[in-house]
């Protein structure tokens, strides 16, 4: 097969700019000028006869064509770099980039990564924490661990675990109320969806929060629990992910009522080619989660 001309410089410029959504950062990474990155991207767009970026006031947004091209280039450049490293060091190593919501990272994954390292010593995990709205294309992630129902367009999702949600608060706050109806006097803390509290009140047999009740929303359950420990209010979160706080009695679960509203999912873009290292990580994690649920 005779390959057509491959514009490597343009592809490198696009990959760096798309991964960081910034021509300036791409120029710094590749040690060239901003103008050089712009020219290379423009040349690639002309060659492909399509736009790869949409320029907006806040920066750059990838077009559909750009989103399709970026993971292929991420994977290709990673493979080239890994192969060169293998030749120079004689050691075959692979990388897996995993984005994970902070709750699952601190409550489960971090304490078990050593087991994976022993299971697959040739694989390096590059871990970053995020909220559910992470841009896997811009971040160059192989996998994203999210909370919800797993329904994501253009993604392959594997269910892992659905811990129920319960009230968690500082011990000092729990002494100031008894039945669930007393909660109307306190600030409610939520993560992502205020309606989760309505579901909990319904499960407890009480009325939904009144329109006048204050609900403080967070984009991270970890931050929400920090607020709960600071006695700002009462959090609705999965106790299973905060056992270290419960064991140390920095927070308590005042009521036994729980509600199940979602779960943790291992997700991957369908366009993201699954490498052997990615498969090793996915099989290990899903096996661990299956054992957890038994």
UniProtKB/Swiss-Prot annotation:
Tell me which Gene Ontology terms the entry assigns under biological process.
DNA-templated transcription
Q: Which InterPro entries match?
A: LysR_subst-bd, Tscrpt_reg_HTH_LysR, WH-like_DNA-bd_sf, WH_DNA-bd_sf
Instruction: Enumerate the UniProt keywords alphabetically.
Output: Activator, Cytoplasm, DNA-binding, Transcription, Transcription regulation
Output one GO MF annotation.
DNA-binding transcription factor activity
Looking at the record, the residues that make up the HTH lysR-type domain are 6-63
DNA-binding region location:
23-42
Q: Which GO terms describe its cellular component?
A: cytoplasm
Answer yes or no on keyword Translocase: no
Where would you say this protein principally sits, based on its record? Answer: cytoplasm
In its keyword annotation, does this UniProt entry include Disulfide bond? no
Subcellular location(s): the record lists:
Cytoplasm
PANTHER family in the record, alphabetically? HTH-TYPE TRANSCRIPTIONAL ACTIVATOR AMPR, HTH-TYPE TRANSCRIPTIONAL REGULATOR
Q: So what does this one do?
A: This protein is a positive regulator of gene expression of beta-lactamase (AmpC).
Q: Which family does it belong to?
A: Belongs to the LysR transcriptional regulatory family.
Query: What is the name listed in the Swiss-Prot or TrEMBL entry for this protein?
Result: HTH-type transcriptional activator AmpR
Q: Give the organism the record lists.
A: Yersinia enterocolitica
